[in-house]
């Protein structure tokens, strides 16, 4: 078994543990570090507004979470370098606080005794950025110790971009994600570094920024600098959609585009990219573990100009890719 510690037991940290409980995996979560008291962490794991009840027993014994018989040590340490990873025999740390998102900051987990770190966000200076299934082959265990899993949107965009680039060569493009609100926004109007995100998340359409288009160049280097994009946050708690508008190097037909995505979803990107012919809305894809659910009905083609669209559960889909990436790091 590979011993995993989760630093930060928020939306992604809890969803990763939930998803792991549904898998037959050799990943063993042995520790959680979060500044919240264990009883509150247990309650938030057991009851979730978006995902529903866990359906497995969760109890607390002192500083230990007992989840369906699994014992998980809980610590509340602000500084990663002071965490007891050596003492607990931790192999890989999942850095999920959203705070230690640089290689320099994440390296503190190595100083504390972990062998590798997976950052569940874009990470400046990471040894490699992986969108599982898209550039997995680029991982080298001898070179890559601090790994970034990019973002939920990058993981949704990467399969869209790869298939289209392989088919006809993307020359340039623009992406827009219509994204569920997140905890980083305000529930009511209040101070925020982004004046739009300062406004009440549950009652506003909030135009803002995304780093997904820039990060795609880390996953698919031949697309570096070719894509740009924006984000629009909308009043739903989960379930997002990304639209990619591109100009490609040659004329293609709509059937060619659809055939390419269908083949990828059934072949090399199976489990990461899903192909749908149904008239979906966001609630239909809640709980879907794919990174990217291609909506074939929304495909538009005019010669070299192509628009493709994919849905994604920005929590559950991404959490499943985190697990896939942890398994990759554990195996190699």
From Swiss-Prot:
The record marks 179 as: Activates thiol group during catalysis. One of its GO terms (biological process) is glucose metabolic process. It catalyses: D-glyceraldehyde 3-phosphate + phosphate + NAD(+) = (2R)-3-phospho-glyceroyl phosphate + NADH + H(+). PANTHER family: GLYCERALDEHYDE-3-PHOSPHATE DEHYDROGENASE 2. This is Glyceraldehyde-3-phosphate dehydrogenase. GO terms for molecular function: glyceraldehyde-3-phosphate dehydrogenase (NAD+) (phosphorylating) activity; NAD binding; NADP binding. NAD(+) binds at residues 11-12, 34, 78, 120, 314. InterPro entries: GlycerAld/Erythrose_P_DH, GlycerAld_3-P_DH_AS, GlycerAld_3-P_DH_cat, GlycerAld_3-P_DH_NAD(P)-bd, Glyceraldehyde-3-P_DH_1, NAD(P)-bd_dom_sf. Catalyzes the oxidative phosphorylation of glyceraldehyde 3-phosphate (G3P) to 1,3-bisphosphoglycerate (BPG) using the cofactor NAD. The first reaction step involves the formation of a hemiacetal intermediate between G3P and a cysteine residue, and this hemiacetal intermediate is then oxidized to a thioester, with concomitant reduction of NAD to NADH. The reduced NADH is then exchanged with the second NAD, and the thioester is attacked by a nucleophilic inorganic phosphate to produce BPG. Homotetramer. The keyword Nucleotide-binding applies. Gene3D superfamilies: Dihydrodipicolinate Reductase, domain 2, NAD(P)-binding Rossmann-like Domain. One of its GO terms (cellular component) is cytoplasm. It is an enzyme of class 1 (oxidoreductase). Its EC number is 1.2.1.12. The active site is at 152 (nucleophile). The keyword Cytoplasm applies. Belongs to the glyceraldehyde-3-phosphate dehydrogenase family. CDD domains: GAPDH_I_C (cd18126), GAPDH_I_N (cd05214). Pathway: Carbohydrate degradation; glycolysis; pyruvate from D-glyceraldehyde 3-phosphate: step 1/5. Keywords: Cytoplasm, Glycolysis, NAD, Nucleotide-binding, Oxidoreductase. It comes from Kitasatospora aureofaciens. D-glyceraldehyde 3-phosphate binds at residues 151-153, 182, 197, 210-211, 233. It is found in: Cytoplasm.
């Amino acid at each position: 078994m590979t011993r995993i510690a989760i630093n930060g037991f928020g939306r992604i940290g809890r969803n990763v543990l939930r998803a792991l409980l549904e898998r037959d995996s050799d990943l063993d979560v042995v520790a959680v570090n979060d500044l919240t008291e264990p009883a509150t962490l247990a309650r938030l794991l057991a009851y979730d507004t978006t995902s529903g009840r866990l359906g497995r027993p969760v109890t607390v014994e002192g500083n230990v979470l007992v989840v369906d018989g699994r014992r998980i040590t809980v610590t509340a340490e602000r500084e990663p370098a002071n965490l007891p990873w050596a003492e607990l025999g931790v192999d890989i740390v999942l850095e999920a606080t959203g705070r230690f998102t640089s290689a320099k900051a994440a390296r503190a987990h190595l100083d504390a005794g972990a062998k590798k770190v997976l950052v569940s966000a874009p990470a400046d200076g990471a040894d490699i950025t992986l969108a599982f299934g898209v550039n997995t082959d680029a991982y080298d265990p001898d070179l890559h110790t601090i790994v970034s899993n990019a973002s939920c949107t990058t993981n949704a965009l990467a399969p869209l971009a790869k298939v289209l680039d392989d088919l006809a060569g993307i020359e340039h493009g623009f992406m827009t994600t219509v994204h569920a609100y997140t905890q980083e926004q305000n529930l009511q109007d209040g101070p925020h570094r982004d004046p739009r995100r300062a406004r009440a998340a549950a009652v506003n359409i909030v135009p803002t920024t995304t780093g997904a288009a820039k990060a795609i160049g880390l996953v698919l280097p031949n697309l570096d600098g070719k894509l740009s994009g924006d984000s629009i946050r909308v009043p739903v708690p989960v379930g997002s959609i990304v639209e990619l508008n591109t100009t490609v190097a040659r004329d293609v037909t709509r059937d060619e585009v659809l055939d390419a995505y269908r083949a990828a979803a059934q072949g090399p990107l199976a489990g990461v990219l899903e192909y749908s012919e149904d008239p979906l809305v966001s609630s239909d894809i809640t709980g879907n573990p794919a990174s990217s659910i291609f909506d074939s009905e929304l495909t538009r083609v005019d010669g070299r100009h192509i628009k493709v669209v994919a849905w994604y559960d920005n929590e559950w889909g991404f959490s499943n890719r985190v697990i896939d990436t942890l398994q990759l790091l554990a195996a190699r």
